[in-house]
Amino acid sequence: MNRRSFLLAALSFVTACGALAATPLQERADWASFFRAADAQGTIVIGDSRAGNDVTFVYDPERAARRYSPASTFKIPHSLFALDAGILRDEFQVIAWDGVKRPIEVWNEDQNLRFAMRHSTVWVYEEFARRLGNVRETAYLRKIAYGNAVVGRGKPFWVEGDLTISANEQMSFLRRLYRNELPFRVEHQRLIKDVMVNEAGKDWILRAKTGWSGKVGWWVGWVEWPTGPVFFVLNIDTPNRLGDLPKRQEITRNILRSIKALPPP
């Protein structure tokens, strides 16, 4: 790592730590039971901002500070980059399929932003990366202090490249997005939050995005209640690959229910 990359990484770490330090931090070693029940190794950070409170809970704080490839969770900021650069106009713009057959059937058709986010359509974001180029991608990453802000040579760089981010840094990013505090147009931030909706109840909305690098699985987002949001960032090891992926939501949902941040199933 060169001196400039080191300084950027240090700045990103300090930014995330500062954001977390601004709220009371409580370690929840007891949440190990949720990971044991799922036979999983990982960390979770919960930011509870309901009813005027602002407290952060963390299971395995050492791992929460460790950086991993963001995988498809990077589609959240990447979509903002594409909107800001004018590559993407809105959620309705049709992104024409390139005709290349891929193993996931829903990828083999025209896409729009909502569809591509929901189905993690990799080729759409590879096209965004091609059109943005490494220089602009790096500038955007530095602008929002996203992880180590390093694109690297692997493709896609958010899975195979050098870009990494910690659970703590993901939490900082999500809080800023929720509050429209990122350096992008407010309407673009609102649009991204809209396409992140996974499900909703009578008085709550769950906005989230999964990610998987092949070795580590993520689930990040928040639950909105009338009294305020509850943010969550989970990552786990996935030695059983596809077989481990459902554990991301299983563990997170069970922990959220334990603090009444999601209703019973």
Feature locations, PLM:
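Flexible glycine/proline-enriched surface loops and loop-helix/loop-strand junctions
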Residues: 59-65, 108-110, 118-125, 152-158, ...
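Active-site SXXK
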Residues: 67-91, 116, 232
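Structured C-terminal helix/loop/strand segments within mature extracytoplasmic catalytic/sensor domains
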Residues: 23-33, 38, 130-133, 178-265
